[in-house]
């Protein structure tokens, strides 16, 4: 009887192990998550392509910000390259504090994420968060944000709900990156007033004559007028399971000028995919990928740099 019971317990434990869907220790599978923003997509597609070229099996799941963090927390994805701080703190910090997600390395510094307006609106007097309510009628009591659940949207919603800067009567217009930019461009062309979520690096800074507002606070977009640092997040334990990929991620630092240039390439050539634009940039700027691949091997343990350079010749 006891022997049979032990066998049953062993079978249950074996079944539970077989149901686990995560990659095995030392697996070649690398699971990225991203959101549908130009810069994060470029970074993720580049990292995915490089890892695939050196023998890994990397993929990229496009999700919303809250779902990215839930997936990392549950161990369903491994890496996220788009942790914009401080604005994502409201979503990310509970997982970072819990320890299921690790803020692994800053992959970009000196970025910006805050409210912006067309330059003609700025020059007419709307220069600071404290000025927005004064021009409520011209703005139709609206602030344009991004997709549902976006961290910037949460900040705007909090500003409205708490009547910060006198914005209690405003509403947030939920859109997406391309829809928001299309609306801003159209309104700017017609001389209509609009306040919207802006960020850098991004091609919007080249195609829209725009200014960023001053006056954000620690409770909104940060005390330094929206200055942001973007971090690479990994699920707990990933760096121990995949030390070579973790080393690559430590090296994976993105200059702002690089993302601006690639973003502009995508804007001027609508047929170009994010990964293709990124590879074209690397082909012209080999010092970037050489730094990324320093000390990195292929999945089979060979030096990664010559393998990737052979792959890059196909672009």
Task: Show where each model-derived region lies.
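Pocket-flanking alpha-helical
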Residues: 44, 64-99, 179-183, 203-211
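Ligand-binding cleft/hinge of the Venus flytrap
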Residues: 47-54, 136-170, 283
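C-terminal functional modules
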Residues: 252-315
């Amino acid at each position: 009887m006891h022997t049979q019971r032990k066998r049953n317990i062993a079978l249950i434990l074996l079944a539970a192990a077989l149901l686990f869907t995560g990659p095995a220790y030392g697996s070649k599978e690398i699971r990225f998550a991203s959101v549908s923003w130009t810069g994060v997509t470029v970074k993720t597609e580049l990292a995915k392509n490089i890892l695939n070229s050196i023998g890994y099996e990397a993929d990229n799941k496009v999700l919303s910000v809250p779902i990215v963090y839930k997936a990392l927390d549950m161990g369903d994805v491994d890496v996220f390259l788009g942790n914009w701080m401080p604005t994502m703190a409201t979503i990310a910090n509970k997982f970072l504090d819990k320890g299921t997600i690790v803020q692994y390395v800053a992959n970009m510094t000196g970025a910006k994420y805050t409210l912006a307006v067309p330059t003609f609106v700025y020059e007419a007097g709307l220069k600071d968060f404290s000025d927005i309510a004064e021009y409520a009628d011209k703005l139709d009591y609206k602030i344009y944000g991004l997709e549902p659940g976006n961290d910037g949207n949460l900040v705007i919603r909090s500003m409205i709900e708490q009547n910060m800067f006198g914005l209690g009567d405003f509403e947030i217009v939920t859109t997406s990156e391309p829809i928001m930019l299309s609306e801003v461009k159209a309104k700017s062309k017609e001389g209509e007033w609009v306040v919207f979520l802006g960020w850098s690096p991004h091609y919007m800074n080249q195609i829209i004559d725009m200014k960023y507002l001053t006056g954000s606070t620690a409770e909104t977009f940060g005390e330094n007028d929206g200055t942001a640092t973007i971090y690479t997040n990994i699920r707990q334990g990933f760096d121990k399971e995949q030390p070579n990929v973790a080393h690559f991620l430590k090296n994976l630092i993105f200059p702002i000028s690089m993302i601006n240039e690639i973003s502009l390439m995508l804007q001027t050539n609508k047929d170009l995919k994010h990964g293709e634009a990124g590879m074209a940039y690397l082909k012209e700027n080999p010092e970037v990928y050489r730094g990324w691949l320093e000390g990195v091997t292929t999945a089979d343990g060979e030096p990664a740099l010559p393998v990737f350079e052979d792959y890059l010749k196909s672009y």
